[in-house]
Amino acid sequence: MVEEVQKHSVHTLVFRSLKRTHDMFVADNGKPVPLDEESHKRKMAIKLRNEYGPVLHMPTSKENLKEKGPQNAPDSYPHKQYPANQGQDVEYLVTGTHPYPPGPGVALTADTKIQRMPSESAAQSLAVALPSQTRVDANRTAPAGSEYRHPGASDRSQPTAMNSMIMETSNTKNSALMAKKAPTMPKPQWHPPWKLYRVISGHLGWVRCIAVEPGNQWFVTGSADRTIKIWDLASGKLKLSLTGHISTVRGVIVSTRSPYLFSCGEDKQVKCWDLEYNKVIRHYHGHLSAVYGLDLHPTIDVLVTCSRDSTARIWDVRTKASVHTLSGHTNAVATVRCQAAEPQIITGSHDTTIRLWDLVAGKTRVTLTNHKKSVRAVVLHPLHYTFASGSPDNIKQWKFPDGGFIQNLSGHNAIINTLAVNTDGVLVSGADNGTMHLWDWRTGYNFQRVHAAVQPGSLDSESGIFACAFDRSESRLLTAEADKTIKVYREDETATEETHPVSWKPEIIKRKRF
C-alpha cells in the first residue's frame, strides 16, 4: 500500500528547511571560532622570529667570549644576557651596538658581526625580554647612534670619529632636502628671417606639388594644368615640360638611387619617368580613386602611394608589383612619408588619424587619434627621431617609434596643406589662406609669419600654399602656390639678433593639450 504524501505549499517547505538549518547550527551561532592554543603559540613564535630576529642575539659578555676562544676580540664593556622566562617583569639594558646599527656612523666591532638565525626558544624568551613601553617611547626621541642606559649609570661619550661621521651624514641629508632651482624653459634658437627672393611663373593652374633633385641643380613641380615642369634652380628658368597625366598632378618625387621621376595624380595613375629619355617607362595600377601623395623609401626600391580610396599601397619599383595594400583608414589618405628606421611608413588621413605602419607585415603598429580634424601634412625631422603633423586645429610633434606626444604648435589657424623642416630646426607650415609660418622646432616658437601678395593674373581668393620644400643646401625655400607661381625664399643675410630679436615670453605652466 502506497502511503500518500501530504502536500505543502512552497512557503511552508522553505520555512521548514530554514528551521532545520537553524536547529543544526544554533548551538554555536554567532560565536567566535575556538582558539587552537598550539597553533597560536607557533604563530606568535614565528612572528617574533621574523619581526625581532635581528635583535634576538645581542653582544655576549666577556666570559662567554672567552669561552668561545681567542679568535673573538674581547669587549671592553660588559653586556647582560637575556635570561629565560622566570615569570617576573625584568627591565633589560642595551649598552652596545647590535648587528644592525641604529643609525649612520655606528662602526661594526668583532662582537657585533656575530649573527645567528634565532631559534624558537629565543623567540619565546623575547616576549619577556622586550623593553617596556616607557623605554620604547624614550628611545624614539633619542638621537640615532646613541646608547640607552639605566638612570644613574655612568655616562660614556661617543668617540670623536663617530661624531664626525654622524655630522657628515646629517649634512648630506640636509643638502638633499635643500630646495632645488626651478627648471628653466629652453630659450628658442635664433633664426634669421626669410624673405621673398624670386617668383617663378609658367604653370597655367594651381601648383600642387614640388620636389628638388638630389644634385640640387633643378627642381620639379606638378600642377592642375596636368603638366610636370622641370626648372633650373639657380636661374628659375624652365628646362622641360612633361605631359601624360589627364588630370591634376598631386605628387612628384625624384629618386636618389636611379634617374627616375615618379608622379601621381587625380587620374588614379602612378607613373615612373625615365629622365634620360623623358618618357614614361612604368605604370603602377591598383588605386581605385585619386592618388594624393607618394614617397620613396630611402634604402630599398619601394614606392609608397596614398589615395582617396582610403588605402596606401606599397609598390616594387622595378617589377611594378603591389607588395602590400595598407588598409585601415576610414577616409582619404592625404599624405605619406617613408624612413629607413622603424616605423618605416607614416600616413595622415582625413579621418583625423595618423598611422605608423610595419612595412614587412603590412599592418598598423600605432594609431594616433589626438587630432580633431583632417591630417593633410606629415614631415620627418632629418636628424631627430621625431616627426610633425599638420591639421587645422594644431601642428603636433611626436616621438618615434610609438608616437609619443611632444607638444602642440598653436597659432596657425588655417587649413595646413604642407610642412617642411631643415637640419637647423626651422619648421615651415603653409596653409590654404596663403600664410606661411616659421617655427623653432625645439621650443615651438613662431618666429616669423609671411603672407606673400597674390601675383597679377590671379584672383585674391587664389591665395594658398599647397606644397613647400627646402633645397638640398637648405639655403632656399620653395613654395608651390594657388596663384600659379613658385616662390623662392632666402634667409635675410643682413639680419642679426639685434635687428630681429627673439620676442619670446615663456609660459610658466605650459598647458599640455592633446
From Swiss-Prot:
The gene is Plrg1. SUPFAM superfamilies: WD40 repeat-like. Signal peptide: none annotated. Belongs to the WD repeat PRL1/PRL2 family. It holds the Pfam family WD40. The modification Phosphoserine is found at S119, S201, S391. CDD domains: WD40. WD repeats lie at residues 202-241, 244-283, 286-325, 328-367, 370-410, 411-449, 460-499. Keywords: Acetylation, mRNA processing, mRNA splicing, Nucleus, Phosphoprotein, Repeat, Spliceosome, WD repeat. The modification N-acetylmethionine is found at M1. Identified in the spliceosome C complex. Component of the PRP19-CDC5L splicing complex composed of a core complex comprising a homotetramer of PRPF19, CDC5L, PLRG1 and BCAS2, and at least three less stably associated proteins CTNNBL1, CWC15 and HSPA8. Interacts (via its WD40 repeat domain) directly with CDC5L (via its C-terminal); the interaction is required for mRNA splicing but not for spliceosome assembly. Component of the minor spliceosome, which splices U12-type introns. Within this complex, interacts with CRIPT. Also interacts directly in the complex with BCAS2 and PRPF19. Involved in pre-mRNA splicing as component of the spliceosome. Component of the PRP19-CDC5L complex that forms an integral part of the spliceosome and is required for activating pre-mRNA splicing. As a component of the minor spliceosome, involved in the splicing of U12-type introns in pre-mRNAs. GO terms for cellular component: catalytic step 2 spliceosome; DNA replication factor A complex; nuclear speck; nucleus; Prp19 complex; spliceosomal complex; U2-type catalytic step 2 spliceosome. The keyword Transmembrane helix does not apply. Gene3D superfamilies: YVTN repeat-like/Quinoprotein amine dehydrogenase. Its main location: nucleus. It is found in: Nucleus; Nucleus speckle. Residues 56-76, 140-159 are annotated as: Disordered. The keyword Transmembrane helix does not apply. This is Pleiotropic regulator 1. GO terms for biological process: mRNA splicing, via spliceosome; positive regulation of G1/S transition of mitotic cell cycle; protein localization to nucleus.
